[in-house]
A protein has these predicted regions:
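Residues on a specific face of well-ordered alpha-helices
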Residues: 123, 143-147, 196
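An active-site-proximal "capping" alpha-helix that borders the catalytic cofactor pocket
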Residues: 60, 141-152
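Short helix/loop segments within enzyme catalytic domains
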Residues: 149-173, 201, 206-209
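Active-site-proximal alpha-helical
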Residues: 171-209
Length: 209
């Protein structure tokens, strides 16, 4: 693979979070696990986020792959912005090169509850797929599968949006969606349709099929 090729997996994430990363890091509490280093507003949050990331990495790898992932050569930095009314979202970036994947970085934001039960599982699932396949997945499959591990409240949003998009002609034709290698300008239908299709396939074959 082209040594210059890098692939960032980006979930819905306000640009403001990326601009705040440096300021958050300056006043953040730190916590380290085997595979993650966490910067969060408080020591307790940093520990909760790090421990949840490790648990999700272990449990979700078993669900999807049937086995745990080996330890990464370098830990993935997690930058967390946590506030009660902050919209949930995250962005995970990494690099594919020569059949290897490395350079993990994760930015997450939201309320404590949504970070722990939705954002972290979603972003960790991206890293599991990247570690296993070592090449980019179709956008619909990657994002669609990752949304299936979120909290029921987030899944319900995807299902409501799917109906809305189909009724308002914002849906994406399947032949276009299957061919997408980048995010479309109107990205929310990709998430909703990807979730619906991934959910259907999982119900038919299971996660490890």
């Amino acid at each position: 693979m082209d040594a210059h090729f890098s692939r960032a997996v980006v979930r819905m994430l306000p640009i403001a979070l990326l601009l705040l990363c440096s300021s958050v890091a300056q006043g953040a509490a730190g916590y380290r696990t085997a595979n993650f280093t966490v910067a969060a507003p408080t020591p307790q949050l940093a520990k909760e986020i790090g421990d949840t990331a490790e648990r999700c990495r272990r449990e979700l790898a078993l669900e999807w792959l049937g086995q745990e992932l080996p330890r990464w050569s370098r830990p993935c930095p997690i930058m967390a912005q946590v506030a009660p009314n902050l919209g949930a979202g995250g962005a995970t970036s990494f690099v594919f090169d020569g059949g290897e994947v490395f350079g993990w970085r994760m930015n997450i934001q939201g309320s404590r509850e949504r970070i722990l039960d939705s954002v972290i599982p979603h972003e960790i699932t991206h890293t599991i797929f990247a570690s296993h396949f070592r090449q980019p997945l179709p956008r619909w499959a990657d994002e669609g599968a990752c949304t299936t591990v979120e909290h029921k409240s987030e899944i319900d949003k995807q299902e409501r949006m799917l109906i809305e998009f189909l009724q308002t002609h914002r849906g994406i034709a399947f032949d276009r969606m299957f061919a997408m290698t980048e995010y479309p300008e109107d990205v929310l239908p990709l998430y909703a349709q990807g979730h619906s299709l991934a959910h259907y396939l999982i119900s038919q074959r299971g996660k490890a099929a």
